[in-house]
UniProtKB/Swiss-Prot annotation:
It is an enzyme of class 1 (oxidoreductase). It catalyses: CDP-alpha-D-abequose + NADP(+) = CDP-4-dehydro-3,6-dideoxy-alpha-D-glucose + NADPH + H(+). It comes from Salmonella muenchen. The active site is at residue 130. Belongs to the NAD(P)-dependent epimerase/dehydratase family. GO terms for molecular function: oxidoreductase activity. Substrate binds at residue 113. Its EC number is 1.1.1.341. The keyword NADP applies. Pathway: Bacterial outer membrane biogenesis; LPS O-antigen biosynthesis. This is CDP-abequose synthase. Keywords: Lipopolysaccharide biosynthesis, NADP, Oxidoreductase. One of its GO terms (biological process) is O antigen biosynthetic process.
Length: 293
């Protein structure tokens, strides 16, 4: 158990990844200040969690508490036609403000959450504004670290995360639901390859990073299994595990012209820390199916 005085300032605590991480941080004995939007209700009530509206962030600076690390998870993908200005607030202005508050918060450790969409060699028109905003913040964070050489900034780039309690519209929960109901599925040829990383492994990567001591600097850390697998193979695994009679209509949906056809994590950084993913896609799907809905 860690020293309970280790306090984490966290954004995105009500998100899929954030909620899972929050549970584990509590188990590890961390205390958490969870920033949220005024209209968002807390997802977990615990004595180790203090929920705080984002606009009240300055109040923390007025206190005498020391923050061990800032963990930024809040993200706006722009999937629901969110105005670009709103995406910019969440993906650039909020984390940049947190960077600027680091001296007042008495912390020199910042962990930011990114995704494989943001890799500079990837181009995906469907999420251009999201990718542009995330890349903008990464560049700003590099400038900040150059100007504050005692700061440790880690950009955690997550591959395709999946697991229980994820949004129903995400590909794995969506296919599982369809398969359970024996409903036919229309999809592309499903030759895209993704590095599917189970949520428990993602959380363990965050915890590993939090517990390690790093030299000051700017780090880009990729989180995944290190191996990619075709969507078609994943669909067939789910069909087998659910004993479904669903028909999968491969090629019924046209592929996007700029589809990212392959992505996998370079796990060398985390491997050097002694971390490795425990869940294969088969093991992860089985665990999801074993959980109560």
């Amino acid at each position: 158990m860690l020293d309970v005085n280790k306090k984490i300032l966290m954004t995105g605590a009500t998100s899929f990844v954030g909620t899972h991480l929050l549970h584990s941080l509590i188990k590890e004995g961390y205390s958490i200040i969870a920033l949220k939007r005024p209209i968002t209700e807390p997802t977990i009530i615990n004595t180790l969690i203090e929920w705080l509206n984002i606009q009240d962030i300055e109040k923390i600076c007025q206190s005498s508490m020391n923050i061990h690390a800032i963990v930024h998870i809040a993200t706006d993908y722009g999937r629901n036609r969110t105005p670009i200005s709103e995406q910019y607030k969440c993906n650039v202005l909020l984390p940049t403000r947190l960077l600027e508050l680091m001296p007042a918060l008495k912390t020199k450790f910042f962990i930011s959450t990114d995704s494989f969409f943001g890799k500079y060699e990837k181009h995906y028109g469907y999420m251009r504004s999201y990718m542009a905003s995330k890349r903008h913040f990464v560049e700003l964070s590099k400038i900040y670290v150059e100007e504050h050489p005692d700061v440790c900034f880690i950009n955690l780039r997550l591959e395709h995360v999946y697991g229980e309690r994820d949004k129903a519209g995400k590909i794995i929960p969506y296919v599982i639901k369809k398969m359970k109901n024996n409903e036919d599925i229309d999809c592309t040829i499903a030759r895209q390859k993704r590095d599917f990383i189970y949520i428990d492994d993602v959380v363990s990567a965050y915890l590993k990073i939090l517990k390690e001591g790093f030299n000051a600097g700017h780090y880009d850390v990729e989180v995944g299994t290190g191996k990619s697998i075709e969507l078609k193979e994943v669909f067939e695994i789910i069909k087998k595990e659910t004993h479904s009679s669903s028909k999968i209509n491969y090629g019924a949906v046209a592929m996007r012209d700029d589809e990212i056809m392959e992505s996998h994590a370079n796990t060398s950084f985390l491997t050097r820390l002694g971390w490795s993913a425990e869940f294969s896609i088969e093991k992860g799907v089985k665990k999801m199916l074993s959980m109560k809905e």
